Swiss-Prot record:
Optimum pH is 9.0. The keyword tRNA-binding does not apply. It comes from Pseudomonas sp. It holds the Pfam family Alkyl_sulf_dimr. Zn(2+) 1 binds at H192, H194, E303, E322. One of its GO terms (biological process) is dodecyl sulfate metabolic process. Alkylsulfatase that cleaves primary alkyl sulfates such as sodium octyl sulfate and the widely used detergent sodium dodecyl sulfate (SDS). InterPro entries: Alkyl/aryl-sulf_dimr_sf, Alkyl_sulf_C, Alkyl_sulf_dimr, Bact_Alkyl/Aryl-Sulfatase, Bds1/SdsA1_MBL-fold, Metallo-B-lactamas, RibonucZ/Hydroxyglut_hydro, SCP2_sterol-bd_dom_sf. This is Linear primary-alkylsulfatase. The gene is sdsAP. It is found in: Periplasm. Sulfate binds at N330, T331, Y332, S333, L334, R335, R340, Y428. SMART domains: Lactamase_B. Optimum temperature is 70 degrees Celsius. Retains more than 90% activity after incubation at 65 degrees Celsius for 1 hour.
């Protein structure tokens, strides 16, 4: 999965004082507002309409709900439940409390405010605790968004993907140790570069042991770069949208958050990162780790930019990372991310079949529950291989017939054999938005119709639409008729124009909220449900300026290379304000023996490595450690200069002037209103 952003989010006015460097991890930032968000959650949530009940009932007839195989698999190997006590931080802050989802009870029928297929998926996800996958392989499930896997070797244990937070990872390891021998951790494997697969590493190993060679950390090529950089440039936007995607502002109940389809939600603890010691660079690499033979398959650009699958030969066990789970995954994440390639994804699954399909006996992933049996594993890999390929090929076939993105998304239906398998349902991704993403991957956002080439911005467009439709009252009156017919998609689309034309029109916002809410109740995708219901909540209640604490991760900051850091600064430069200004600074990092020139000119900030400008306004000498301390607000530029940690020759005011031109971003920007 998916959110490891850095941002400069602030809460409050857009004109708040400049904060030099403030970073946050988007998973963590979104999760950190869970508890405070509950206090204003949707007491105005409405019941399901007859149209919604009918839509959800129809799905009960379409899918084989009498097939309980998934429940048998999810219970298989159960050893112990999660402890009843929630995980809290040192200050009493809530980090993880799966008991909030106790209302999702196995065996109970879906409430009419929930899609029955998503309800079923949430029931399965809530089957939690410590499980044996096969002899010597164990998983802790539902102690975070992802699973933590533990493999017993000759001298110790190897941990796969230590969750999001240090606290949840430690609790997962403690649970394992209560029921298994307390062998030392001798290796960690990061399957890919999303934070829910590495953020808790300091909860299971000590970095001193890594540096001493007692613990090895394996990761795919490009892991560190992508773990830090994937979402840096759009961190605040991604984080805000993540609060919608994971439903962090919603109450967990039958009219609110059910989970995310991939897991329940994200933990809100301490995100950490220890750089890998061993890099997997290509398919076919074999490593003996603690007496077991690991065969690796490099799969970049599948579910993550840096990802790998691997097979433990002695166990005949395939770790599918996040490329084959019990859901149609995202080829585009609704929080915002670069689009993933479904064709490449399909080919990786085909390669896994080629490499290990004859021998594999169990497949487990870093979300959900395992699949046992050679025939069953091959079937899941084959069907999901064909699912992603079908999305790719059918999107392009229809595009080449002249259909547009939206038209294709309405037309494409998966073959029945694929679509009726619960593991291929769109609980996290969705067929609709994955098709749209595939179109954009190949053809971009423009559909070819020149009428859509230079559209008006939403508010300007909305005012004209409302005027031409006879005014807001006329639109709302007609929209109510469509609402009563159950045409919620159209109501949401047309009333959105009224909301953007007249943002203070509460009647319009209430009708829009009602329509979005019913769409949420019908949604099979967890993120779709969360987006719809969070949008409805903010339309009714407004955007609540909740605290967004500084969740800076020292490990992430230290892992940023200077090139990325300077790009990040350049993104924050208020270009229009400095278009006619010119500043040149030389930077000398004495510990790294690296020199840079920064030049602010024409409204941009360029940096050049290995160069010192002859006529620079000033030369700044410092160490990377000092830069880290300033970034983490452990010191200030002024204090660092006073202590001699930063030396400035030339115009000492130019560095401060440059930093005064950096923008800060309000986390709580509007989404469903202008």
């Amino acid at each position: 999965m998916k959110l490891n952003a850095l941002s400069t989010a602030t809460h409050g006015s857009r004109s708040s004082p400049v904060k030099l460097w403030k970073f946050s991890t988007s998973f963590l930032l979104a999760a950190s507002i869970i508890v405070s968000g509950q206090s204003w959650a949707a007491e105005t949530a409405k019941p399901a309409t007859d149209a919604t009940k009918a839509a959800n009932d129809a799905l009960l007839k379409e899918l084989p709900f009498d097939d309980k195989t998934s429940f048998d698999l999810a219970h298989k190997g159960f050893i112990a439940p999660l402890p009843a006590e929630p995980i809290k931080g040192e200050k009493g802050n809530m980090i993880w409390d799966p008991s909030k989802y106790g209302f999702i009870k196995e065996g109970e029928a879906a409430p009419d405010t929930t899609n029955p297929s998503l309800w079923r998926q949430s029931q399965l996800i809530n089957i939690s605790g410590l499980f044996e996958v096969t002899d010597g392989i164990y998983q802790v499930r539902n102690y975070d968004l992802s699973n933590m896997t533990i493999v017993e070797g000759k001298d110790g244990i190897t941990i796969f993907d230590p969750l999001i937070s240090q606290e949840t990872a430690k609790a997962a390891l403690d649970l394992y140790y209560k029921h298994r021998p307390k062998k030392p951790v001798v290796a960690v494997i990061y399957t890919h570069s999303h934070v829910d697969h590495y953020g808790g590493v300091r909860g299971v190993v000590d970095e001193a042991d890594v540096k001493a060679g007692k613990v090895k950390i394996y990761a795919p090529l490009g892991f560190l770069e992508h773990a830090v950089a994937e979402n840096v440039m759009a961190g605040t936007a991604m984080s805000r949208r993540a609060s919608y995607m994971y439903g962090n502002l919603l109450p967990p109940d039958a009219k609110g958050q059910l989970g995310a389809g991939l897991g329940t939600t994200t933990s809100a603890g301490t995100v950490t990162l220890i750089p890998p010691t061993d890099i997997i660079k290509e398919t076919g690499e074999t490593h003996v780790i603690d007496g077991l033979t690991y065969e690796f398959m490099y799969a970049p650009g599948s579910e993550a930019p840096a990802e790998m699958l691997y097979y433990i030969k002695e166990k005949k066990a395939l770790n599918a990372a996040e490329d084959s789970t019990h859901t149609l995954h995202n080829t585009y994440s609704l929080r915002g991310a670069k689009i993933r390639d479904p064709l490449a994804w399909s080919k990786y699954l085909n390669e896994a079949l080629k490499l290990w399909g004859d021998d594999v006996q169990v497949m487990y992933a870093m979300h959900h529950w395992p699949v046992w049996g050679n025939k069953e594993v091959r079937e899941q890999l084959s069907l999901q291989r064909d699912m992603y390929r079908y999305i790719n090929d059918e999107t392009l076939r229809l595009a080449n017939k002249g259909y547009t993105m939206t038209e294709i998304a309405e037309q494409v239906k998966l073959p029945k054999k694929i679509a009726t398998k619960f593991s291929n349902r769109g609980y996290y991704g969705s067929l609709n938005h994955n098709v749209k993403a595939t179109y954009v991957l190949y053809l971009g956002w423009f559909i070819g119709n020149p009428a859509t080439l230079w559209e008006l911005p939403p508010a300007d467009k909305a005012k004209r639409y409302v005027e031409m439709m006879g005014g807001a009252d006329a639109v709302l009156k007609k929209a109510k008729e469509y609402y009563d017919k159950g045409d919620f998609r159209w109501v949401a689309e047309v009333v959105n124009h009224v909301v953007f034309a007249e943002p203070n029109n509460q009647a319009a916002k209430n009708m829009q909220a009602d329509a979005l809410e019913q769409l949420g109740y019908q949604a099979e995708s967890g993120p779709w449900r969360n987006f719809y219901l969070t949008g409805a909540q903010e339309l009714r209640n407004g955007v609540q300026q909740l605290p967004t604490p500084d969740t800076a991760s020292p490990d992430t900051v230290k892992a940023m290379d200077l090139d990325l850091f300077f790009d990040f600064l350049a993104m924050r430069l208020k270009g229009p304000d400095v278009a006619d200004k010119h500043i040149t600074l030389n930077l000398d990092f004495t510990d790294l023996k690296q020199k840079y020139t920064l030049e602010m000119v024409n409204g941009v900030l360029n940096h050049t490595e290995g160069m010192q400008a002859k006529n620079a306004d000033a030369t700044v000498t410092l160490t990377r450690e000092t830069l880290n301390n300033v970034m983490l607000k452990q010191t200030t530029l002024k204090d660092a200069e006073s202590s001699g940690d930063i030396k400035i020759e030339g115009d000492k005011g130019k560095l401060e002037e440059l930093m005064s031109y950096m923008d800060n971003f309000d986390f709580w920007f509007n989404i469903v209103t202008p």
